[in-house]
Amino acid sequence: TMSTSSRQEAMEGEPVRRHVSDAILNYDKPVYGLFLAIKIDTNTAETFRHGIWYAKGDVKQRLDIVPLSLEQFRRHFVSMFEGKQARPEHLRDLILQCETERDNLEAPAWMRYIETVVVERSSMVCGR
């Protein structure tokens, strides 16, 4: 999204979670979501940190959605190609590692953790 304000969560929080939920229901494989924005609003990060969605029939789902700034995504994406490591597993592993601390951290700290993970993983796949 191009939004950077607190409106970001209001405009994108529900549709992104709904789309990921729909994909989970439609595909018999793991589903991961990336939310990309110029800058991630803290309230948006908090929405995805919880990652809860109720599908039809009040079926509770825990969604795997990680918010990344465009710069964070660019850094990781470019590093995969520079390191000749452009594989979907690297993006999946980035998402999974970013999620490891979401239940232990509040949104501001989780956003800092995500930044640390992006920097470390980008260096790793690039071979720096």
Where are these regions (language model features)?
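Catalytic core segments in nucleotide and nucleic-acid processing enzymes
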Residues: 1-115, 121
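N-terminal, leucine/charged-rich tether regions that mediate assembly and partner docking
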Residues: 119-128
